[in-house]
Regions:
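Amphipathic alpha-helical interface segments
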Residues: 1-73, 79-86, 100
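Long, charge-rich low-complexity segments
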Residues: 36-51, 55, 108-115, 139-151
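Contiguous hydrophobic segments
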Residues: 12, 17-33, 123-151
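Catalytic phosphate/nucleotide-handling subdomain of diverse soluble enzymes
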Residues: 61-147
Length: 151
């Protein structure tokens, strides 16, 4: 999903395509169903809706809740709150949602008031700047290889 979004795909379309792919894979049914549940859920952000997707205790449930939060939230903060304020494994679902949101709109994340209090914010900001540079200038790859060696 994230690779498709990084390539310019819409989150909802990327998720639907991923669900279709997983539905065809041996053992992929649970993941496909979890993604489809997030896509079908009403975009009301209600706790009951989040809980209908599970508790986030399995990878499939955590992905479903994080995806739902990103689709249901009208802002970075609202989406992250949806992912973080349920009775399940909310630290995991919020972390996954935060990564999705950062990919969807890195500028909104970096200028949000919470960005200043995140541990490692300076490192995260540098990674975002480098990613954005690479996304807009393929020639930056050689320069960034010096910073991030290993291929």
């Amino acid at each position: 999903i994230l690779a498709d979004v990084a390539g310019g795909a819409d989150l909802e379309k990327a998720a639907a395509q991923t669900a279709e792919t997983y539905a065809r894979l041996p053992g992929g049914e649970e993941t496909a169903q979890a993604i489809q549940a997030a896509l079908r859920a009403p975009r009301d952000g209600a706790g009951e809706t989040v809980e209908s997707l599970g508790g986030g205790w399995t990878a499939e449930e955590a992905l479903s809740i994080a995806l739902y939060a990103c689709l249901a939230g009208n802002s970075f903060e609202e989406a992250l709150l949806i992912a973080a304020t349920h009775g399940g494994d909310s630290d995991s679902t919020a972390a996954i949602a935060g990564n999705m949101l950062g990919l969807l709109d890195p500028a909104a994340v970096l200028r949000h008031r919470w960005a200043e209090i995140v541990e490692g914010a300076d490192i995260i900001s540098q990674l975002v700047r480098d990613y954005r540079q690479l996304s807009s200038d393929i020639n930056a790859a050689e320069e960034l290889f010096e910073v991030y060696p290993g291929g």
